[in-house]
């Protein structure tokens, strides 16, 4: 059963052995991620020097449930822009939040500025 929606920053904490990793590792088997945030995660790994093949392999080893991006998420992400613009949230951030809101689940992130949002339950890992 899915109990959390992970932001790319939370997944990267695990893959890059960053602070907060332990909190995310404990909930991996109860978490899902938006396809948009998968792209964001893989992009960051490639930017850090991984091949796309190695990045995908590392991500796949986490065995996360991936939720495909659909019209409802698209609309909610767009609707969130004016509510999050002042914090500089990216499209990926808004896609994660949109999915969490639509699924009525907590969003798990390493981005501390999300704590200032009152859109859904947010768990900051560090």
Where are these regions (language model features)?
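Short, well-structured N-terminal submotif of metal-dependent ribonuclease cores
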Residues: 1-33, 45-60, 126
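Acidic, PIN/NYN-like endoribonuclease modules and their adjacent C-terminal/linker elements
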Residues: 2-3, 97, 101-126
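Alpha-helix capping/helix-boundary segments
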Residues: 10-11, 37, 73, 95-96, ...
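A general structural signal for well-ordered alpha-helical segments in protein cores
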Residues: 21, 38, 52, 74-77
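Short acidic-hydrophobic, aromatic-tinged amphipathic segments that line or gate anion-handling sites
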Residues: 66-69, 124-126
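Active-site neighborhoods of divalent-metal-dependent phosphate/nucleic-acid chemistry enzymes
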Residues: 67-108
């Amino acid at each position: 059963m899915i109990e959390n929606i992970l932001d790319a920053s939370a997944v990267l904490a695990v893959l890059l052995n960053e602070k907060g990793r332990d909190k995310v590792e404990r909930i991996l088997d109860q978490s899902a991620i938006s396809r948009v945030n998968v792209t964001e995660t893989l992009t960051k790994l490639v930017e850090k020097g991984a091949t796309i093949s190695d990045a995908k392999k590392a991500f796949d080893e986490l065995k996360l449930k991936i939720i495909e991006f659909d019209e409802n998420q698209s609309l909610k992400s767009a609707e969130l822009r004016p509510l999050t613009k002042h914090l500089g949230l990216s499209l990926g951030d808004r896609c994660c939040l949109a999915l969490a809101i639509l699924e009525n689940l907590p969003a798990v992130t390493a981005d501390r500025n999300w704590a200032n949002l009152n859109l859904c339950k947010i768990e900051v890992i560090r």
